[in-house]
């Protein structure tokens, strides 16, 4: 993979990244930061080298009064959700950068938020240990309380299935839980981590779940059975994991490294470091919809951009 350049505009750690799923979107990526803002980024038409900015801010989304911890993009519309330590979720129109709606019910910092695959539901979680399901009008429809997590819920995502909607959550209680959205029932609890879980993600086909956390282990699970398929020890606390949308690859961001693994061989196929520099810790990652570009967010306030070469 090749280093293409950076995006510069945040004044704090880049905490979360998300890429549009619509083909041909002029927005390349949306980022959130500890500076209390989110930014939607467009291509830089005047870029001539990796030393110039890879992209330019399209809109800066301002309004939160605390760190912004997570962003999720609608699959078929130009809307984004942001979660914040100010205990709120906001919905934004990316066409004009305006806040359209606030979601207020969490009693502590909100750490994670996600759109459902059909964009009709929203799920959120945070330091009050409660997972909440909302409609897009801002009404809280369900709270997952029975068999819930016993500590902060740090990460949450939907499976891509519309027929059997599932939510997966990761927590500081060292577990992952799989939830039926319609009934709010915990279908299974996945145990395998020896310390808190910081990230969970579901594969594009909905068959696999990957989790990572403080113990430095990336675990791969069969989502339908809850079976742990294998473990990759990266020997450093894991900040985020992301499946490639079109290759059997998994990117893992840790305190020490940013690596891409081939899931068949379980081998590292790329260690991502810009030429001549050792970047600061990577805490967020996102693949473009076509799988040809990877964005990484860092503690030095920069977003770095990587491309896949033709040989890969």
Curated annotation (Swiss-Prot):
Gene Ontology terms for molecular function: ribosome binding; translation regulator activity
Intervals holding WD repeats: 9-42, 63-93, 105-135, 148-180, 192-222, 233-262, 279-307
Annotated GO CC locations: ribonucleoprotein complex; ribosome
Gene it is expressed from: LACK1
Keyword Ribosomal protein listed: yes
One Pfam family, short name: WD40
Stated name of the protein: Small ribosomal subunit protein RACK1
Similarity remark: Belongs to the WD repeat G protein beta family. Ribosomal protein RACK1 subfamily.
Domain of life: Eukaryota
Gene3D superfamilies for the chain: YVTN repeat-like/Quinoprotein amine dehydrogenase (2.130.10.10)
Keyword Ribonucleoprotein part of the UniProt annotation: yes
Keywords from the UniProt entry: Repeat, Ribonucleoprotein, Ribosomal protein, WD repeat
């Amino acid at each position: 993979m090749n280093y293409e350049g950076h995006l510069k505009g945040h004044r704090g750690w880049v905490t979360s990244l998300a890429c549009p799923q619509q083909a041909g979107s002029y927005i390349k990526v949306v980022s959130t930061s500890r500076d209390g803002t989110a930014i939607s980024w467009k291509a830089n038409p005047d870029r001539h080298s990796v030393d110039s900015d890879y992209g330019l801010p399209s809109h800066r989304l301002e309004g939160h009064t605390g760190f912004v911890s997570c962003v999720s993009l609608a699959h078929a519309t130009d809307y984004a959700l942001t979660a914040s330590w100010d205990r709120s979720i906001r919905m934004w129109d990316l066409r004009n950068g305006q806040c359209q709606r606030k979601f207020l019910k969490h009693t502590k910092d909100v750490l994670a938020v996600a759109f459902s695959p059909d964009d009709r539901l929203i799920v959120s979680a945070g330091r009050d240990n409660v997972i909440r399901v909302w409609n897009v009008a801002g009404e809280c429809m369900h709270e997952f309380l029975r068999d819930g997590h016993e500590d902060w819920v740090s990460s949450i995502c939907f499976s891509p299935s519309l027929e059997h909607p599932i939510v997966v959550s990761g927590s500081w209680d060292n577990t992952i839980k799989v939830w039926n959205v319609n009934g709010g029932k915990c279908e299974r609890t996945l145990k395998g981590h020896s310390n808190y879980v910081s990230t969970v993600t579901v594969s594009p086909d909905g068959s696999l779940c990957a989790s990572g956390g403080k113990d430095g282990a990336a675990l791969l699970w069969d989502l339908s059975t809850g079976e742990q398929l294998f473990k990759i020890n990266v020997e450093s606390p894991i900040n985020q994991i992301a499946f490639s949308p079109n290759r059997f690859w998994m990117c893992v961001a840790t305190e020490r490294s940013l690596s891409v693994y081939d899931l068949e061989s379980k081998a590292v196929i790329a260690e991502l470091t810009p030429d001549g520099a050792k970047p600061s810790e990577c805490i967020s990652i996102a693949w473009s919809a076509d799988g040809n570009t990877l964005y990484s967010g860092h503690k030095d306030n920069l977003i770095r951009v990587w491309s896949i070469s033709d040989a890969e």
